[in-house]
Amino acid sequence: MEYRQLLQQYWGYNDFRGIQKDIIHSIGEGRDTLGLMPTGGGKSITFQVPALAKEGVCIVVTPLIALMKDQVDHLLQRGIKAAAIYSGMTRQEIIKTLENAVFGGLKLLYVSPERLFSELFLSKFRHMHVSFITVDEAHCISQWGYDFRPSYLHIAELRKIKPEVPILALTATATTDVVDDIQERLNFRAKNVFRMSFQRENLCYVVRIASDKETELIHILQAVQGSAIVYVRSRKRTKEIAQLLKDNDIKATFYHAGLEHFTKDIRQQDWQRDNTRVMVATNAFGMGIDKPDVRVVIHMDSPDSLEAYFQEAGRAGRDGKKAYAVLLYNSADARKLHKRIGDNFPEKDEIRKVYDSLAYYYQIGVGSGGGHTFSFNIAEFCSAYHLSLTLTDASLRIIERLGYILYENDPNNSARLMFLLSRNQLYLLDNLSQREDLVIDALMRLYGGLFNDYVYIDEQLIAQRTGLTPQQLYLILKNLNARHILHFIPQRKMPYINFLRSRVDGEQLVIGKAVYEDRKKEFEKRIQAVIAYAENDKICRSRQLLRYFGETDSEDCGRCDVCLDRGQKSASEQKMETCRQAILDFLSDHQRHHLTDLDTLQLPERHLDEALEYLVHEELIQLEGSYLWVE
């Protein structure tokens, strides 16, 4: 079936947007392809449509579990066979999903990068008929990117197993260097890049110089109505700012990675359903969240890079209507940004000291410790050896990048359990309390595979089903564990250190140029770019951002604080206004007109399409099928 027919049949759209069609044809022809599309540009269509058109299963690599689940649900609702593999599934569920892919029962299989290299996945992958591999958030593979993830580096190894399978890499943020690095790391057979302009014509970028950021924040949220996200750097600040907003009669809540899964889900749902207007969050919030009507994104603190800022700011106005991205800035921010360089890259002697102290802490001698995992309390560790918490955390991350340890500082793994008795033995038990009976019954109804393997459980859900409090449920599970009826592994919240190699003496710790000096230099460049953006009040904000991402021929936007201060509008904005006004004048008779009637206006097709989209979004005209009118 032709691509456009698939788009109409499954999504109900008449045509592709922007560079979607170019990317689809490229991967459809078997060419390695990199697509650069801003947030809201329709990335998912570029791999979902060709996945349906081509024989076999498309493997989609993404780090975003929430996005995986959301996209799989939407695909299944459309009658498209899709599945995902993520933490929380039993081994039997994973095997069933993989075998479904092997035997042709799936068109799309979503997998996190960490799970790609389990023996189980690789053994099944070898037998799959793979149409192509999609790498979402592809900037994560680049060490020059702002969100490098080491697990992404191994994706190219899949090509050794299936060298004929093409790769589609997608990202919403990438500089010229990162674009080249992505293609090199994924072993592209030939360079092949499709770029969609990162320009957002409905988004107004604003920098507010504010000595009192809290007062300015309240002023903005009172002036701009609608859904909002406020980004801050610390977990503590999320709670403080949310309370400040509530004290000023603005409905708000807060979100950060340290909250319980259940709490995060509830708060996210309340915000998405507009029960809560403002989400105050760290950068843990936003990726994979589909809420098109966010009217303003406000950064109380400057991010570490323009890539991060552009992606977070881009969560505003995805419905095409006017929206704002505001950065609150003052002279103290520049000092804080410069301080982050030293905080992220401690002196090499400090890194070696942390490594040796870690070995002393766990009593690991030189030449031993490889493969061992230890619970880790960074506050206790720093106190014991009189170390700075900030510099220690950064040192551990560098040591991890060097390949000596695995440092998991923010785990939130769900609880797991497995029955130690058979189903028949459970039924014969006569010494269970009523509550224990309720819990066992709920477990058997909610989860399969409990008699064969450890299964991740949702304690909040089980508590709801049984009418117990989470504390009561926890005590019952601990009691059943003590009586050897089941084995219960509570939710792990304690960070841990895994020694990937046997210990070496700190003086022999090899801190390579690529991991330290080169990355530090790149970090400094990104910090300086943020400062330059915030302090440059002479060049259009949109032009500054577009230039950073390699678009050097853009015009002034006419909407940002710089342009409005100058009282200027770009030539393109003036053309668009002329085009919109011509359409409104044509429809001023309040009659229904066919779209083809607009041909008499002789407007450029690109301007006509954009003008119509704007007028429909702003509800200035009505569009039904191929007819339009003004009420």
Identify the meaning behind each predicted range.
Residues 276, 293-294, 298, 302-311, ...:
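C-terminal accessory region of SF2 helicases/translocases
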Residues 1-10, 14-44, 50-54, 59, ...:
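Helicase motor core with emphasis on the C-terminal RecA-like subdomain
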